[in-house]
Amino acid sequence: MAVGKNKRLSKGKKGLKKKVVDPFTRKEWFDIKAPSTFENRNVGKTLVNKSTGLKNAADALKGRVVEVCLADLQGSEDHSFRKIKLRVDEVQGKNLLTNFHGMDFTTDKVRSMVRKWQTLIEANVTVKTSDDYVLRVFAIAFTRKQSNQVKRTSYAQSSHIRAIRKVISEILTREVQGSTLAQLTSKLIPEVINKEIENATKDIFPLQNVHIRKVKLLKQPKFDLGSLMALHGEGSGEEKGKKVSGFKDEVLETV
């Protein structure tokens, strides 16, 4: 048999190993920056493919949503059960400027609050902020024993539940409509709205564990770079040029 027709020799070339290329050589790191509303602005890093040809890395990063624990943003473990969503709106060099995109509770926190011998009350409203962000806000509350109560249970009647739900909806609507998205975020962190709901409903039925459980962003206005820069404490109109001392005197002396 001729050598050129030997199948074993012809198949030997196909067994060569291909050169392994590290996929991370085609990627680059970017720093995620949280708005100035939070104490810790350095959220972390994210990966993206490098810009090649018509594909720009900035286009792949814009709109990316990251989920961060509020305890990491505030430096306090008291907020460990709340998760904040941040959306990348602008790319500046190696920094990604983000904006608030939503909030949620961890599953274990919600389950730990649900107990027997009490009534769970939930309410949600869809409201537009003063800067045209449409949000759906979810609130949760639980009844508790009244003062000097002997009975073990603290169940609320249907009329009480409807009245409490109405008060919660009114407070949420008023607080959201009268605030910008940044102002609302600053109210959600110290739970100012929760205490207001608890005080407003104490005459109907005493409540405990009142929380804004979830905030969902439904619609956002047209992107404004100036507003985003002001949110991150950069490029505000209050910055003025520094006065150059002694410049006028030096010019007069030379003349």
Swiss-Prot record:
GO cellular component annotations of the record: cytosolic small ribosomal subunit
UniProt xrefs under InterPro entries: Ribosomal_eS1, Ribosomal_eS1_CS, Ribosomal_eS1_euk
SMART domains, A to Z: Ribosomal_S3Ae
N-acetylalanine: modified positions: A2
One annotated GO biological process: translation
Gene Ontology terms, MF aspect: structural constituent of ribosome
Ribosomal protein among keywords: yes
Record's keyword terms, sorted: Acetylation, Cytoplasm, Ribonucleoprotein, Ribosomal protein
Main location: cytoplasm
Localization annotation: Cytoplasm
Domain of life of the organism encoding this protein: Eukaryota
Complexes and interactors: Component of the small ribosomal subunit. Mature ribosomes consist of a small (40S) and a large (60S) subunit. The 40S subunit contains about 33 different proteins and 1 molecule of RNA (18S). The 60S subunit contains about 49 different proteins and 3 molecules of RNA (25S, 5.8S and 5S).
Recorded family membership: Belongs to the eukaryotic ribosomal protein eS1 family.
Protein name in UniProt: Small ribosomal subunit protein eS1
